[in-house]
Amino acid sequence: MWERERKKFLEDIRKKSLQELEKLLDELKLELTRLRFKKQVQGLENPMEMRKVKRNIARVLTVIREKQLRGEG
């Protein structure tokens, strides 16, 4: 199931413009900050959430770089 989620996420972000990707990146970074804070204060129910968000940030950064190299945006 995670494989399907990952592929769907990649398909979705590849369709977005650079501006949309940068906005998504900001949202993901904010989510990671919230998770880090929550982890310190009360602990996380699912620690894998942080890992998932970090990997999604990396995926978005990769797609942004791909688009920059192709001259899109």
UniProtKB/Swiss-Prot annotation:
One of its GO terms (molecular function) is structural constituent of ribosome. The keyword Ribonucleoprotein applies. InterPro entries: Ribosomal_protein_uL29, Ribosomal_uL29, Ribosomal_uL29_CS, Ribosomal_uL29_sf. The keyword Ribosomal protein applies. It holds the Pfam family Ribosomal_L29. GO terms for biological process: translation. Keywords: Ribonucleoprotein, Ribosomal protein. It comes from the Bacteria. One of its GO terms (cellular component) is cytosolic large ribosomal subunit. NCBIfam families: L29. Belongs to the universal ribosomal protein uL29 family. PANTHER family: 60S RIBOSOMAL PROTEIN L35/50S RIBOSOMAL PROTEIN L29, LARGE RIBOSOMAL SUBUNIT PROTEIN UL29C. This is Large ribosomal subunit protein uL29. The lineage of its organism: Bacteria, Pseudomonadati, Aquificota, Aquificia, Aquificales. The gene is rpmC.
